[in-house]
Every structure is written in C-alpha cells, then in structure tokens.
C-alpha cells in the first residue's frame, strides 16, 4: 500500500510538472507568434441541440481544441457522442474572426458538421454571425451586469435534405445571482426550414420550431464548471423535442 502511495505521489508530481511545462510552452508560443492554444472537455447527461435531442436522452461526453490568434482569427474542432450515425459521433470544425467594436463583441465564421461513417450528403456548413455585450446595472450592485447576445446562422443543404435554406435565430441573456457564485441564463431560438421537400423526416415533418433553455450555472465545482438546464421545444413534434432537464460538467485548460 505504501508503495502505491509513493507511485501515486510520483505520478501526480509528474503530472503537475507536465502541466507546468505545457503552460510554459503555450505561453512562449503566444508571446512569440500571437497564437494561443486551448483545450476543453465536457460531459452532459443529455445532448440537446437547438431543442432537438441528439443522444436520445443518453449522456454525451465531448472534447475540443481551439487555436486563436491575437488578430482575432481562430480555428477549432469539437467532437461529441450522438445516438444517430454509423459511429455514433459528431465532429465539428469551425473557423472565424472575432473582434470588439466599442462595447460590442462580434463573431463571424463557418461551422462544418461532419458525421463519420455517413455519406457526405449529411455533412453541412453553417455560416454564422453573433454580437454580444455586457450591460452594467449598478443600481443592483457595483459589479453587477447582464450579458445579452444575438446569434444568426444560415445552413444550405441542411443534413442533405432537399431544402434550399435553413435559418437559425437565437437570443439569450446571462446574469449572476448577487451574493452567490451562481448565474442564470435564458436562451430562446428558432429553426426555420425553408420550402421543405423530399426528406421531410430529417426535419421531423415540420418547417420550423422554437426552443428555449433556462440554465442555472453553479460556477466551479471540484475543478469543473457545472450547470443544470431545463429545455423545451414547443413547436417540435416527436420525442426528440420533448422537454426535460440535463446537467453538464466541463473543464478548459
């Protein structure tokens, strides 16, 4: 048993040294080139995408990596588990340009959805634009502020369905709960499938639906960002749009 603890202590020390070296090398890279590297991992009890279940209410782990440049340009990749598809996985690649203009933060980019093992027809691009800001409300608290945002996106040939256009509109707001480490956010969105024909089942036989989320953020719990979310998609027919709750844990480094 003593030997086990010695080995464990040695492993933990080596891990800390490795992280320190990693942080140092990333810091050196950013100073020399303006390029930053970030990693993230998460676990969710249910993967819900714009009101639609992607994991049939099963848990979904995910991992991602991001490259950013001081100019505002960025690239990233993300992968998570789903219940559909040959290999039960979704792989996303994205790139764009983020910048600030006065009190507003803008983001313009392209997100490519890929489903390994499926035909190329199921993969598609989503061209997006978002704007957000932070509004201080000193009448509530000296450091209190709310953070609203607007997200607009256009996806041609959505999931390979015979549809010329799909538009996404989403707006949300987040605020801390004074005197606590908690935060609360509300998201409302719409998926609009234009001129649906052919593979209508890929849009669940509806031309559009609304969805919303209410999320309670717990801050950092045991080194992980934790949250609980209630979701609903009132205009979506079928089990994939049923309301419910899910919890999420995440970490970035």
Predicted regions and their residues:
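Transmembrane beta-strands of outer-membrane beta-barrel pores
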Residues: 43-49, 79-83, 99-101, 112-116, ...
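Detector for outer-membrane/organellar transmembrane beta-barrel domains
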Residues: 124-204
